[in-house]
Regions:
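Secreted, periplasmic, or luminal enzymes acting at the cell surface/secretory milieu
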Residues: 1-44, 48-52, 70, 75, ...
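Intrinsic-disorder/low-complexity, polar/charged segments enriched in Ser/Thr/Lys/Arg/Asp/Glu/Gln
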Residues: 28-32, 78-82, 119
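Short coil/turn motifs at secondary-structure junctions
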Residues: 38-40, 54-56, 88-90, 116
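Short, hydrophobic/aromatic beta-strand segments
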Residues: 42-49, 61, 93-96
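Intrinsically disordered, low-complexity Pro/Gly/Ser/Thr-rich segments with frequent PxxP/GP/PP motifs
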Residues: 57-95
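Edge beta-strands of extracellular beta-sandwich domains
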Residues: 120-124
């Protein structure tokens, strides 16, 4: 058993996260979240974006890391980061058809400090299916 979850790290300051928004832009979804350094020292924090299929029809991991962004913040500073989720971010490889498939349906988008610490999450609905040969 691992001692620390994937993405775990320590800092000499504190960060607050707020306002997770996920918006649809064409075939992509854009995840945005604001991070504020609430401590007395400058520091860096990493926002990790995980995707979870709410109703999987094929075997896949419960939660998959699909993007991340490292932010350096001075004390009291707030920055908003944007992470683009393409159709491939929602896809799973189908060994029978030999292609990547992102099905339509409900997915949970989570913003996390590490794999075990989901700070905020929201559901999105993909309205179309996407396929791609490797």
């Amino acid at each position: 058993t691992p001692l620390f979850p994937f993405g775990f790290g320590l800092s000499y300051t504190r960060f607050d996260w707020s306002d997770l928004k996920v918006t649809e832009q064409g075939d992509n979804f854009i995840a945005e979240i604001s991070v504020t350094n609430t401590g007395a020292r400058a520091g860096s924090d990493v926002v990790q974006i995980y995707v979870e299929d709410a109703n999987p029809i094929m075997p896949r991991p419960l939660r998959e890391l699909k993007g991340f962004s490292k932010l350096h913040l001075e004390p009291g500073e707030t920055k908003t980061t944007r992470i683009i989720l393409t159709p491939r971010s929602f896809a799973v490889f189908d060994v029978e058809s030999h292609e990547w498939i992102a099905r339509s349906g409900t997915f949970v988008i989570g913003a996390a400090r590490n794999a075990a610490d989901i700070v905020s999450s929201t559901e999105i609905n993909r309205s179309s299916e996407w396929r791609s040969k490797p």
